[in-house]
Design a protein with these regions (language model features):
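Sec-dependent N-terminal signal peptides
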Residues: 4-13
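C-terminal segment of classical bacterial N-terminal signal peptides
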Residues: 13-19
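Extracytoplasmic cell-surface/polysaccharide-interacting catalytic and binding patches
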Residues: 19-94, 99-203, 212-225
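Conserved metal-phosphate-binding beta-hairpin within the catalytic cores
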Residues: 208
Length: 225
C-alpha cells in the first residue's frame, strides 16, 4: 500500500510540475530591444562561436535580442538613466529559446567536446552543472532576463573586471579583488538596473531579471530571428 501511495505521489508531483512549467511558441508579448532603445549595442554571443561551447547555438538565427514588453519598458528606464551618466548598453543575451538551453545540456553530456575552456579555465566541464552555471531551465527562456554591460557613449570599453560567461568567482558581483574602478562600474550598472525594477544574482554581475516578470512559469521556444 505504501508503494502504491508513493507512486501516486510521484505521478501527481510530475503532473503538477508539467502544468506549472509550460512551453510556448507565442511571441506576441515580445519585442526587439532595438524598437525601444535605439542606441544599444549588441554582441549576441550565442549567435556566434564566441561562447563556452565553441559553436553557434540552436535557436539563434539572427544576432537580435528580444524581451517581454514589460521587461523592455523597465530596461528603457535603466538605459535612460545610464545615458544621462554617459553610458550605453551592450547586450550579450536576453530572451533565450528552450532549444538553446537544451543545446547547452547536450554539450555538457558530450564527453568528446570541451568547447572553449577559456570560459571555464579553473573548472572541469562537469562542474558547470554541479555549480549551477548551466541548468536544464533558464530564466532567460521566460523572456524577462538579460545579460548586459556598459559601454561609453562613444562605444569605448568600460572595465567591469571580467567578461561575459566567465565561469569563475571573478564574475561574482561582490568579488573582493576588483579594483576600485571595476567596483564602481559594476555598481553603476547594478544601481540603474535595480532602480528600474530588475534584480541580479550572486554568481554573474551581468545577469538581471525583471522582479515582476509576466511569465514566471512559462518557457518560450521560438527562434531569435
Amino acid at each position: 500500500m505504501k508503494k502504491v501511495l508513493l507512486i501516486l505521489l510521484i505521478l501527481f508531483s510530475s503532473i503538477q510540475t508539467s502544468i506549472a512549467s509550460q512551453i510556448s511558441n507565442d511571441k506576441s508579448d515580445f519585442a526587439p530591444i532595438s524598437t525601444v532603445i535605439d542606441d544599444a549595442a549588441y554582441d549576441i554571443r550565442y549567435y556566434s562561436s564566441n561562447n563556452f561551447t565553441g559553436n553557434k547555438i540552436n535557436g539563434y538565427k539572427a544576432p537580435n535580442a528580444y524581451m517581454t514588453k514589460e521587461a523592455l519598458a523597465a530596461l528603457k528606464k535603466a538605459a535612460d538613466d545610464l545615458r544621462n551618466q554617459g553610458y550605453r548598453l551592450l547586450i550579450w543575451d536576453s530572451y533565450r529559446p528552450q532549444k538553446a538551453v537544451d543545446n547547452f545540456v547536450a554539450w555538457i553530456n558530450n564527453p568528446n567536446d570541451d568547447g572553449d575552456k577559456t570560459f571555464y579555465p579553473c573548472l572541469k566541464k562537469s562542474d558547470l552543472i554541479k555549480g549551477n552555471y548551466i541548468a536544464r531551465k533558464s530564466g532567460h527562456t521566460r523572456g524577462s532576463t538579460i545579460d548586459l554591460t556598459l559601454i561609453k557613449k562613444d562605444g569605448s570599453f568600460v572595465d567591469m573586471g571580467g567578461t561575459f560567461d566567465l565561469f569563475s568567482e571573478i564574475s561574482h558581483p561582490d568579488y573582493n579583488k576588483l579594483t576600485a574602478e571595476q567596483k564602481k562600474n559594476r555598481k553603476i550598472l547594478h544601481d540603474a538596473m535595480v532602480k528600474a525594477g530588475f534584480k541580479g544574482i550572486s554568481s554573474e554581475w551581468w545577469h538581471y531579471t525583471l522582479k515582476n516578470e509576466p511569465f514566471p512559469d512559462t518557457y518560450f521556444n521560438f527562434d531569435v530571428e
